[in-house]
Amino acid sequence: MRKIGIIGGTFDPPHYGHLLIANEVYHALDLEEVWFLPNQIPPHKQGRNITSIERRLHMLELATEAEEHFSICLEELSRKGPSYTYDTMLQLTKKYPDVQFHFIIGGDMVEYLPKWYNIEALLNLVTFVGVARPGYTLHTPYQITTVEIPEFAVSSSLLRERYKEKKTCKYLLPEKVQVYIERNGLYES
């Protein structure tokens, strides 16, 4: 059975924290690949102003192109409405019955697991992999695999704020993503 990691998110923008998490889990669990799963509309971010999927997808392609064990999974982009992990993983497990999926989440999402849509059924489809994130614990009533990663306290919201305030973001995200953001005037207001 193939072992594939999945890291979902809005990736608005993708940054070195995402890549670090994916790479650390890839090596720690001896995965075949890690798939980045951009969300169409995350249920917990409905109503928030999110960069277009076309731009987020392009930035994600730029961020992951150098790593042959990273791929982008477009499963959620064809659906309208909120992107529920259960619906996505149900589709993926049917499409890839020979794959054991490891769904990678940060400490913030580990704490939020009891509120996830159809969580009990989802636990039958994936193995959750929790990674520590500053300010969050990995305590949950559910069985998860934990992977220790070097602390890298950067988030997409921090980067959007830094761009808005015209602060440097060098060394926080891949240079090609940074150039794309600056050329297209993303996150300026």
From Swiss-Prot:
> Is Hydrolase set as a keyword in this record?
no
**Recorded GO terms, molecular function?**
ATP binding; nicotinate-nucleotide adenylyltransferase activity
* Pfam families for this protein: CTP_transf_like (PF01467)
The record's catalysed reaction(s) read: nicotinate beta-D-ribonucleotide + ATP + H(+) = deamido-NAD(+) + diphosphate
SUPFAM superfamilies linked to this entry: Nucleotidylyl transferase (SSF52374)
| GO BP terms in the entry | NAD biosynthetic process
The entry sums up its family as follows: Belongs to the NadD family.
Which PANTHER family does this chain map to? NICOTINATE-NUCLEOTIDE ADENYLYLTRANSFERASE-RELATED, PHOSPHOPANTETHEINE ADENYLYLTRANSFERASE
**Summary of the function given for this chain in its UniProt record:** Catalyzes the reversible adenylation of nicotinate mononucleotide (NaMN) to nicotinic acid adenine dinucleotide (NaAD).
Would you tell me the protein name for this molecule?
Probable nicotinate-nucleotide adenylyltransferase
Gene encoding the protein: nadD
